[in-house]
From Swiss-Prot:
Originating organism: Danio rerio
Gene Ontology biological process terms in this record: mRNA processing
Location(s), subcellular: Nucleus
Positions of modified residues (Phosphoserine): S247
Keyword Transmembrane helix: no
UniProt biased composition (Basic and acidic residues): 1-10, 436-462, 476-506, 549-562
Listed Acidic residues bias regions: 16-38, 87-104
Region (Disordered): 1-107, 300-328, 371-400, 418-570
First-listed, main subcellular location of the protein, grouped into a coarse class: nucleus
Protein name as annotated: Pre-mRNA 3'-end-processing factor FIP1
Amino acid sequence: MSAEEADKTTTTDASAGDEEEEWLYGDEGESKETEEEEAKLTAAISATSTTPVAEDAPTTTNNSSDSATPPTTTTTTGNGVASQEEAPGEDEDSESDSDDDDDDVRVTIGDIKTGAPQYTGYGGTPVNLNIKSAGSRAYGAGAKVKGVDLEAPGSINGVPVLEADMESFEEKPWRKPGADLSDYFNYGFNEDTWKAYCEKQKRLRMGLDVLNIGSTTSKISVQQGRTGNNEKEITIPAHASKAEFTSPSNLYKAGLNQGRISPPHWAGPPSQDLSYYTKTPGTIDVIGGQTATISRVEGRRRHNLEGNNIQVISEHSSSEVEPEVQKMPPPFFPPGPLPPNIPPPPFLPPPVSQAPPLIPPHRMPITVPPPNFPPPTGGPPPSLIPTLDNSGHPGGYDGRPVAPYPFPTGGFPPPMQGAVNPWPGLMENPKQWDYYPRRDKEREKERERERQRDRGHERDHSPNAGPYNSMAMCSDEERYRSYRDYGDRGYERHRERASREKEERHGGRRHREKEEGRHKSSRSSSRRRHESEEGDSHRRHKHKKSKRSKEGKEPSEERSADQENQEAME
């Protein structure tokens, strides 16, 4: 191999190695800049160590295996890997030994602690490189990582929040005008309610009082959502100890019957329905929710000195439940059998086969007798009294028995037996009788006006036009007879009115037919007149033509006769 070829190969190998180093480790200018930055960053850290490592100058390592090899310079780059720069005039042998030189450099990435073991490789001087990011800080040898304890109670300057006295603060920014309380107090607290809450928590921790709060000005309401009021709003945690809120069962179980309380069983004023409070001890009773979870709690806690129970008032309280029970309509009591010595009530219907048409008389309601008259002295007709079977119940129509009404046990009185109050005693209010005569009177006045408008000579033939005292009915038969007569008269009036309307319709039809006939006759007469005039003119025209034809025929005949005479003469 000639010297020129050796120089060419040496230059090509060196250039190839430089390209690889630049591709792997960057340019020399960049390495110098990063070297200066690393020197500034590690100056403070290396000052704490006993044997500081100077990184300002490049570290020189000697290869112990080959003393004739020229020294290589190792520099630290930005990525923490040592790069070697070969001395000028290096040949192929030194290029081949670059792999052995890498084994002498020990690169440590991370923290360098004081008294760390020094690694010696192949008898060379070890190199410790401390490479760290700019934002990190070095921890001490005995430093303990301190985090945020979420379970620990909050503190203000080392004093627990519940024990801190707000009066001792020099500045009270929440008192300034325009300050938002939510920036200083959570859960809707203000200064007064926070003091009351701290006092309550203090007493609860000391075990002096469970729910009694010393200050009477504090109003603590327990609600689920934020309502914007200044009262305290807290939520009861699900894992709260229920032993502190025990509600003794003997406080509420006042010997109530758990069955249904019917109105006849009430001996005095109705007692409150405390079924909401008869729960097992150790639970918090919430009206309107379930026993397993607290869905919504409204109201204020009562300052109860007798027991440690929680009384919560919600949508349905016991005072609101009772009026609902009292407002229920009384149950329907079916009437019992009537005694045979008392006339039936007026609204009892007669048998269908014998009942007259139900048309009420003038100014007389059909349901009840007049207010100033006693009931009829004589009994009603036998057909109006319902037959009683052996069981005491009224028999049914057409021989069919009536099923007995099943009275429920308790809460209903037995069927009425014995004497019954007389009917006039039940009908002392005359106001309810005034409505029906007034309505009938208005109807009759309207009918009278219609009759007078239709036919002036028609009058009302009803004998019941007088007041009530003009009708003296001695029995039900006379009443039914008057009903029948009134129905017959009403039917006659209806028939007369229908016949009158029919006559009016027929009269109007005849009038229309007469008018139409008059128009037809006038049209036919005008048509006949027109035809006669046309016929006359036509006849005159024909007469003129015939006269002309006759006149024309006469001279023609004369001429023909003259011609014949001339021919004969010839």
